[in-house]
Amino acid sequence: MQIRWFGHAAFILESGSLKILIDPWISNPLSPVSLQDVKNLKPTHILVTHDHFDHLGDAIDISKATGAPIVGTYELTLEVAEKGIPEAQTLPMNIGGTIKLGDGVEIYMTQALHTANRGAPSGFVIATPEGTVYHAGDTGLFKDMELIAELYDIDVALLPIGSVFTMGPREAAIAVQLLRPKKVVPMHYNTFPLIKQDPEDFKSRVEAISRVKVYLMKPGDTLRI
């Protein structure tokens, strides 16, 4: 399995024959790739944590071009259907639910402490034969992250650290304590001035309270598991 970061909260996870795109705001200022580059990757599924512009992003355009179904809350899938995505090309679910994508990959939807234009914000646990990844979406710190750790053995946690709209470095470091992943990657920072952060601050905070390995990825980098 490998995970590539496109900046902000946008990632693509590859496992077996599946290419799972997450929160594809590919036109974000940090992205090292073009929208056409991502379409050419031919993602098999598109996961969207909520419908804010910086997470729904280019999902509709990519889905129309590739046929990849959009996975999200029921309300989010209704929203994208209103914008031209066929209902058959959506996979609605809700917090606490699970869907199977094939190749031994399962998607679990978790809560997130945030807002959305329609429906509820969410996170995703992506369980593959090679490992398990938790994409927190946009969220504040919440105590039930401990339950996520009890339910799923997380290999990699992708956590926002930008503050203002999500956790900052201090809160995200505590989230690492609650989630107990083997590795953590900070995201959702330095895309625009309001969420400017020093990722080294997050790294030092995590290392002061845990043995979790912190990977400071640059947009375009790939992490292999």
From Swiss-Prot:
GO molecular function, one term: hydrolase activity
Tagged with keyword Hydrolase: yes
InterPro entries for the chain: Metallo-B-lactamas, RibonucZ/Hydroxyglut_hydro, UPF0173, UPF0173_UPF0282_UlaG_hydrolase
Record key words, sorted: Hydrolase
Keyword Hydrolase set for record: yes
Pfam families: Lactamase_B_2
Family membership noted in the UniProt record: Belongs to the UPF0173 family.
Protein name: UPF0173 metal-dependent hydrolase Pisl_0803
Species of the source: Pyrobaculum islandicum (strain DSM 4184 / JCM 9189 / GEO3)
High-level lineage: Archaea, Thermoproteota, Thermoprotei, Thermoproteales, Thermoproteaceae
